[in-house]
Curated annotation (Swiss-Prot):
GO terms for biological process: glutaminyl-tRNAGln biosynthesis via transamidation; mitochondrial translation. It comes from Paracoccidioides lutzii (strain ATCC MYA-826 / Pb01). Its EC number is 6.3.5.-. The keyword Protein biosynthesis applies. InterPro entries: Asn/Gln-tRNA_amidoTrfase_suB/E, Asn/Gln-tRNA_Trfase_suB/E_cat, Asn/Gln_amidotransferase, Asn/Gln_tRNA_amidoTrase-B-like, GatB, Gln-tRNA_amidoTrfase_suB_CS, Gln_synth/guanido_kin_cat_dom. The keyword Secreted does not apply. GO terms for cellular component: glutamyl-tRNA(Gln) amidotransferase complex; mitochondrion. Allows the formation of correctly charged Gln-tRNA(Gln) through the transamidation of misacylated Glu-tRNA(Gln) in the mitochondria. The reaction takes place in the presence of glutamine and ATP through an activated gamma-phospho-Glu-tRNA(Gln). This is Glutamyl-tRNA(Gln) amidotransferase subunit B, mitochondrial.
Amino acid sequence: MIRQCLSRRAAYPCYRIVAGGTEPTGCLYPQSCRISRRGRDWSSTSRRAIDTQTSGASNGADYVPLRQQLKEQARAKRAAKRKGEVSPPEHEDWELTVGIEIHAQLDTDTKLFSRASAAIDDVPNSNVALFDVALPGSQPLFQPATLIPALRAAIALNCDVQRVSRFDRKHYFYQDQPAGYQITQYYEPYAKNGSIWLGSHDGIAKEDGVGVEIGIKQIQMEQDTAKSQELPSSTYLLDFNRVSRPLIEIITLPQIHSPATAAACVRKIQTILQSVGAVTTGMEMGGLRADVNVSVRKRSEGVGDHQYHGVTGLGQRTEIKNLSSFKAVEDAIIAERDRQIAVLRAGGAIEGETRGWTLGSTETRKLRGKEGEVDYRYMPDPDLGPVIIGYDVLCELKAKLPVLPDALLHNLVQDPKYGLSIDDAKTLIELDDGDRLDYYKDAVDILVTLQKDLSDDFSGGKVVGNWVLHELGGLLTKSNLHWDSERVPAQSLAEIINLLSRNKITGSTAKSLFAMVFDGDKRSIGQIVEDENLLLQSLSREEYIALAEEVMRQNPKMVMEICEKRQLGKIGWLVGQIKRIGDRNRVEAQKAEEILRELILK
């Protein structure tokens, strides 16, 4: 449970986290307060309009359409890939260095410093406590339960969890932060000195070889800002539901030297956070954002003059903010790398600044000068006490931590029960917050039970994977639907595959059955097969020969190409013709191919 105690250093409460439950105390306002969305009084927060001035970019005489720029870039990338190049030749004398700051929304019921709900899909400005909008007299109340998913993340990322951590104020003014400061953990974060291993299967750059380890400087808890929406009239609408939602900021060391590896790092961290239930959603739903710090230096000129997070010898860095996809991370780094190299080659100097990047763009743009520690005026938050984490809590969380993605990947590939390819296993792990992987495992377990009577060793895991990823995935995509494990229950999928593997139905019949269930047929698989008379009535050898000879007679040119030029891939097309002129539900593709090979290649 969570006990309130007095700090030796101040009269405000601190929180001691020990095993057994949670009990929040020390609130100025003992219950969550919501601000009315009605009326025109000074406390209304339904909408806050802020006028801004923007200037449009002008097109010069050398303007090149964006579509043409992207096509030329894609063409150059394909050419480089064909030549086996790992980076453009003109950049070989330049070293790129990247550090990443990842902001992830924690999966919690309440906000970080109030009891207001942390729900993300509610009506705008309906979950707002007094402290969230910095009303006079309101104070933060740390919600200890929000620390649990943060600790899971730190353990999964191999961090040293600090027994004592504290909150600080980071001062700046912007419309999405009404207090004029953000509460974070600058000086004493709750986790330090972590690491993440990226293997070749994670999509790292070729120059990184079989794998690379990236250090994590620290992970800190902090509050999120309001969600803003810009209108064409240079006005912003603000939703304060997001203010004080709990975030963790994961800061990597600047040890990444390739855009592809940077994107792989963000992807891997997201997968790990999702696997341990630390975060709500991933990048695709806005639950995770990344800032990247980019610098370059010329190898032939020795080490650079700058340092970042204790790593020395670097070039001057710039920061690119709010990247919301893995592709955006990679493309923004490429664009900024190319810009910095061009500036340095022209004799210029790189300025430390914050830059932005827009999806589909080919270059970054300056947003503002880069603030430093002095600009933010960091100071300990006088309204919040230290957070003390008990060793027993860490032991309990470690014992209950789910299997991490790398171990899970190894199991899916190496265990004969599953026997998946690395690509299929990775896809299952990353899709739908792990729900599709759970569905796959359920279907495999059911199929194992259905095939206990077979003497051969079970090898249906790969078949189930193909159906889950390709057949079911294709139907979901075609229907523009999100993942739903009840669309085709795992029991139904296993029964279809069982019938197919026992040659009781054909492949085309299996797909038809699957589509019927997907479209809402509530009958059992056995009932559908019986009602629709779908059981395979095998053709005799003589019937297969007759069908094959008819197809060969209709396609003499193709038969000649197969026989004389050994174009064996065309046999599959002839099998399709046998299915067309015969009974599709009775023709077995494997037997039809065997007869064709026997007649053509004899």
